Amino acid sequence: MGRTQKKNSKGRLDRYYYLAKEKGYRARSSFKIIQINEKFGHFLEKSKVVIDLCAAPGSWCQVASNLCPVNSLIIGVDIVPMQPMPNVITFQSDITTEDCRSKLRGYMKTWKADTVLHDGAPNVGLNWVQDAFTQSHLTLQALKLAVENLVVGGTFVTKIFRSKDYNKLMWVFQQLFDKVEATKPPASRNVSAEIFVVCKGFKAPKKLDPRLLDPKEVFEELPDGPQNMQAKVYNPEKKTRKRDGYEEGDYLLYHTVPIMDFVKVEDPIQMLGTTNKFTLDKDDHEWKIVKKLKQTTPEFKACIEDLKVLGKKDFKMLLRWRKAARELLGLDKDEEQPEIETVPLTEEEQIEKELQEMQQKQNLKKKREKRKQNEIKQKEITRMQMQMITPTDLGIEAASIGRDSLFNLKTAEKTGILDDLARGKKRMVFTRDELAEDNEIQIDENAPLSDRDDLADADELESQLDAMYHQFKARRIERDAHFKAKEARGGDDDAWNGFDEVASDEEPEESKKDYVDDDDSDVSDSDSDEAINQLIAKIKGETGDKKLSAKARALFNDSIFDGVEADLPSEEPQAPASSEQGSKKRRLEEVSEESSSDEEEAEEESDSDFEIVRNEKDESDDDYDSEDEAERSQKEKHAREVDIATVEAMTLAHQLALGQRSKHDIVDEGFNRYSFRDRDNLPEWFLEDEKMHSKINKPITKEAAMAIKEKLKALNARPIKKVAEAKARKKMRALNRLEKLKKKAGLINDDSDKSEKDKAEEIAKLMKKVTKKAKLKPKVTLVVAKGKNRGLSGRPKGIKGKYKMVDGVMKNEQRALKRIAKKHRKKSKH
């Protein structure tokens, strides 16, 4: 008896068929769920309860039993019977019936499923439209079972046929799951219309709309919307063909309409889109009247003969003619609107109306202020989260709030908040009562509401412009690397702060500060500036004991340390007056203390009968040497800090070095027409634009440009950090090996049992190990495939190591490649 040949239509006996036979799976579809599981995060390995709907013959249940954790509950159900499987519960039932639901509840008890699988399909082959709808209906029933049994965050995998109901099902899935994705695994045949949808993150809504799982509601056919005839009339060139067939009862493609119907119709555009020709009835009385219009030209009569060839201009001409015809026939008469009598308001009603308007304006103002306060609070919260606790950041942020909310240092000093500001406290916006205590700050409550609204609108417009400018800068930073580097450096500061002078012995630093802060000085012209100076000095740690560092002075300037020094005993021993070991630093401190208390000395001199004369001590040669060393070190430090990086700076340095310019010339150049421009209360975008153009073009020299070029050449010639570090590591390893060699050689020399010859040989071996060269990569031997080597298979005779067979064709190809590369290089240069 001969063997029957198994059918192989659509390539059914493919490699997955044979793989399933080898692995022991019941069907090739098992590889579909394996590939889906690997692609979407191995959800089966995390599932303790799995339900497989339409499970026959059971291949997906086999995969689940292999991949799920031990002692997992796996249930398979199908309308046809299945062979039993180990670790899997199977029963026969229809998933669309109540019997299936009750059996599932009986097996699961109080558990919920982590994953629900569905690979079912109807018996196909009659009508594709009907088969696709039946599959979509079956998928919706499977989703209904999954919604009843899935745990929160569960996974649902189902099969769908590509059809017109696909998008409707996807919309339903997206309402119930967080993430919905369609996929087609490689195990699925390309000729098959099936695709698989993986829904992850079940939302488990408390109340579910029953229409969401009702097939009648989900797959309802919606009527088509009205045709866009306006697009046909105003864009006749763009034609989109839709093969929808004929309208019911109308089987003609050519339509003619009398011209007077076009005049009387309410929707002329609809008629123009569906009509091919307008006919003229010469016996019509109304046409005889309309024919006398000046718009009724021969061109008009030619256009109405074939409407399908007209353009936008021609259609507009027809609509203008229709409007003129309707006016002539009296069809566009405006409906007379009944006159509304206006009753004048009484005095009480007028007052009440004005009060309502004022109340509305007041409510708008309160709403605006509340919104501003919420924005300020939100900014403060963001600032605290970003740890922006420095007073500079707070002041910059508060400057955009407005005059009423802007803090004042003088008010802060009076209310006792200045110390909190120095410590970095966040509260900088004062209340209305605190501002009222200060006589300099007045809040105009009687200002008209309209003026205040205009000011608020102006502020809002300015803030919008600033925001737009910041967005522009952010986009430019992303696009332009040079601008990003410039912003990171902070840009060029045009403000000139004068020359930094080094404090001399005769005029210590503290005495200079006292001189600057004197009442006769012009720096502190107001109480506000004085408070600012005090706050800055307190923050920087300039006040306090000079023996401490700047950070320590800033710490001990805090108000919590006030009065602590009075309680602590003095631990500093007083040095005798005759001691000769006092350093120059000690003498500087004594001189600074004397110079900082000039007023007290003057009072003491007036009260005392003795005249106090300062003791002038001769400084030794060592002091002069130390002064020279200090001055030299300070110059070296200044040279390290100042880097001449531009051609202008190099030109200026050359001129100063050669005596062509002096310090006074540079100071005079600092006073120009751009120096004293008013920059207060100007927006940032305006200042940035002005900074680009409001600057003096300083001259440069050829020598300075060459010097900068040579400097950059030297910088570029230096190796990069990685190369330098690699060389240093290599050198360090060599030194370490040499040190080890020295130790070993010393041990060999100390060994008395060995002869001098043996010692020399061992030391030579050690030296050979240290100085051995790295292994060179073996070269590939090129063998020309001609003569006895032509058509040779295997290794040629007399060739050892790696080899490569070459011929004349390969040589020509290499030449051609070099020629093409050279041509491309020439093109790229142009």
Swiss-Prot record:
**Chain residue ranges for the region called Disordered:** 485-529, 565-642
Q: Tell me which InterPro entries the record gives.
A: RNA_methyltr_RlmE, RNA_MeTrfase_FtsJ_dom, rRNA-MeTfrase_E, rRNA_MeTfrase_SPB1-like_C, rRNA_MeTfrase_Spb1_DUF3381, SAM-dependent_MTases_sf, SPB1-like
Catalytic residues identified in the record: 159 (proton acceptor)
Per the record, where are the segments of Basic and acidic residues compositional bias? 631-642
Name the principal localization, coarsely classed. nucleus
Question: What is this protein for, i.e. what is its function?
Answer: Required for proper assembly of pre-ribosomal particles during the biogenesis of the 60S ribosomal subunit.
- Member of which family? Belongs to the class I-like SAM-binding methyltransferase superfamily. RNA methyltransferase RlmE family. SPB1 subfamily.
- UniProt protein name: AdoMet-dependent rRNA methyltransferase SPB1
- Species lineage: Eukaryota, Fungi, Dikarya, Ascomycota, Saccharomycotina
- In the UniProt record, the gene name given for this protein reads SPB1
